[in-house]
């Protein structure tokens, strides 16, 4: 953790307590750390552990016909940019904070009950960046419906106003040549390339498993955040097709 002398130490206490709470919720143990004086507050954790080889989720192996499911709304980077500009509404801030503070633990518990083709978490490369990665590794094409994807409250409006983090433009430059945009509005591209903090799980699952998985998501309380965003198709000239 890095922390400046000019801030109240009670803030540091809250940061450490919040981190410890999430570590405990995840079922892990916090075993130590280092602290330094810094001009800006910084906090982060690294994870060390073991996983059974049969329980590893791969980010490749998607099969044509699979259904693509996303467990959280996207747009956290854009909402955070609006917060920095002091233009975010209180309700948008609350929703973004709730989503970012939510672990993927419940989603993982649902996913591990099924024989999914592939699964990854959406982070700094944005939804499209991770879709490109997964589709490329699987040698398939993803067909995504931009209007079926769940977005955070007001994220579209903030993106329309230009409140887009620099990372979104870097993500776009990296993989836009692999995306068939069609007539999709530029604002939606900003949302799809928006770097996510604590993003959800992107899951590729067979149609046979899809309905039962969605039933379990609803029963687990994720019905307000999970969305079916598209399907997997045989590989074409582009890795991603937007509709």
Language-model features: locations:
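Helix-biased detector of long, well-ordered alpha-helical tracts
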Residues: 1-243
């Amino acid at each position: 953790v890095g922390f400046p002398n000019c801030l109240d130490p009670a803030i540091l206490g809250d940061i450490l307590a919040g981190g410890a709470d999430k570590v405990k919720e995840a079922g892990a143990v916090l075993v130590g750390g280092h602290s330094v004086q810094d001009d800006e507050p910084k906090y982060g954790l690294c994870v060390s552990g073991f996983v059974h080889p049969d329980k590893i989720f791969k980010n490749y192996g998607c099969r044509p016909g699979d259904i693509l499911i996303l467990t959280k709304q996207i747009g956290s980077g854009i909402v955070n940019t609006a917060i920095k500009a002091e233009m975010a509404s209180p309700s948008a801030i609350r929703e973004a904070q709730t989503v970012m503070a939510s672990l993927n633990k419940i989603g993982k518990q649902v996913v591990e009950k099924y024989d999914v083709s592939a699964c990854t978490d959406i982070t700094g490369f944005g939804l499209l960046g991770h879709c490109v990665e997964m589709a490329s590794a699987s040698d398939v094409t993803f067909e995504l419906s931009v209007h079926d994807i769940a977005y955070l409250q007001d994220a579209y409006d903030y993106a329309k106003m230009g409140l887009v983090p620099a990372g979104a433009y870097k993500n776009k430059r990296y993989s836009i040549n692999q995306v068939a945009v069609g007539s999709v509005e530029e604002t939606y591209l900003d949302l799809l390339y928006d770097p996510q903090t604590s993003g959800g799980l992107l899951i590729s699952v067979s149609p046979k498993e899809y309905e039962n998985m969605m039933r379990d998501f609803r029963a687990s309380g994720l019905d307000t955040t999970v969305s079916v965003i598209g399907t997997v198709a045989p590989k074409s000239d582009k890795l991603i097709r937007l509709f």
